[in-house]
């Protein structure tokens, strides 16, 4: 497979590193959250931005729940702020962590919020009542990332003790626990066909695991530094990895062949760590954000 990469534009406005991205209120919008404590929404058509809200601490994670018109915002002080997007009113603060909230995920199937904390805790709350349902101390390191596999009713959790943990989504029983990386496991992502679990670590490796027995299929030395995010294209044919080594890499999702390296030299990419990526269905744009305070929009097309 051959692809071409075109940079559409760079969006600027945040005053500090950007740590969080999520889909916006419509296909052509995205949300961003930054060290400047501001949530903004960006229009991928006009490239204009709107300030949505500001918060008392650095923003590390966001989760848009369109079904409820809510935006969940995780901050460096361990709080999750619940924002009503209709009136931009902050309606609740969930205080279940004592350190950064690195990831927030919502499951429509369970109607629960799942959070990964820098305090080593993995917490689950009801979205209806915001009550804490369960909290697990997984390790003495940071819990970094969460993903769901609804076909097998499993939750994968990555943490700083190098471990990947697999939980039953209904009972929260731990089903598997295995060393995912030589250094911190930063990101977990089930493939769209849910046959594989992809993980990225501080060791720069992209690891592919067989769902079920979670035996390793492939270990790729993908980056020179930590991998922070993994995103699949809307058609599932491509996947992208984002790294502290300042690059985004595009891979064939079936063969895991490296197709392109997006960097500063070749594509006027990021100056510093690339912290977050999301692949939009709007024009098939790949969106990236990093420590350079920039959001970049990329068009990735087969040749």
How would you describe each model-predicted region?
Residues 25-26, 66-67, 108-109, 150-151, ...:
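Residue-level detector of Asp-centered blade-edge/turn motifs that repeat once per structural unit
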Residues 44-46, 85-88, 127-130, 169-172, ...:
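Short loop/turn segments that connect beta-strands within beta-propeller blades
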Residues 39-42, 80-83, 122-125, 164-167, ...:
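WD40-repeat beta-propellers
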Residues 33-36, 74-77, 116-119, 157-161, ...:
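Conserved strand-to-loop turn within each blade of WD40 beta-propeller repeats
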């Amino acid at each position: 497979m051959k692809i071409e990469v075109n940079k559409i534009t760079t969006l600027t406005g945040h005053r500090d590193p950007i740590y969080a991205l999520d889909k916006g209120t419509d296909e052509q919008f995205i949300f961003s959250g930054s060290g400047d404590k501001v949530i903004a929404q960006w229009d991928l058509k006009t490239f204009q931005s709107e300030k949505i809200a500001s918060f008392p601490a650095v923003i590390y994670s966001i989760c848009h729940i369109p079904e409820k018109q809510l935006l969940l915002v995780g901050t460096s002080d361990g709080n999750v702020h619940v924002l009503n997007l209709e009136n931009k009113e902050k309606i609740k603060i969930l205080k279940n962590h004592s350190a950064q909230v690195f990831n927030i995920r919502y499951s429509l199937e369970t109607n629960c919020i799942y959070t990964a904390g820098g305090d080593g805790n993995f917490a689950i709350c009801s979205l209806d009542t915001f009550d804490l349902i369960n909290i697990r101390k997984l390790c003495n390191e940071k819990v970094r990332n969460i993903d769901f596999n609804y076909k097998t009713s499993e939750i994968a959790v990555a943490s700083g003790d190098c471990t990947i943990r697999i939980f039953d989504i209904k009972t929260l029983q731990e089903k598997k626990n295995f060393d995912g990386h030589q250094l911190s496991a930063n990101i977990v992502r089930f493939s769209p066909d849910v046959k594989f679990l992809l993980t990225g670590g501080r060791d720069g490796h992209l690891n592919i695991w067989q769902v079920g027995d979670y035996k390793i299929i492939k270990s790729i030395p993908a980056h020179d530094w930590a991998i922070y995010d993994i995103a699949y294209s809307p058609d599932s044919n491509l996947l992208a990895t984002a790294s502290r080594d300042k690059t985004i890499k595009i891979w064939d999702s079936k063969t895991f062949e490296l197709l392109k390296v997006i960097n500063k030299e070749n594509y006027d990419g990021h100056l510093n760590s690339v912290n977050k990526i999301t692949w939009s269905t709007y024009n098939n744009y790949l969106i990236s954000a990093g420590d350079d305070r920039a959001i970049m929009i990329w068009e990735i097309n087969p040749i």
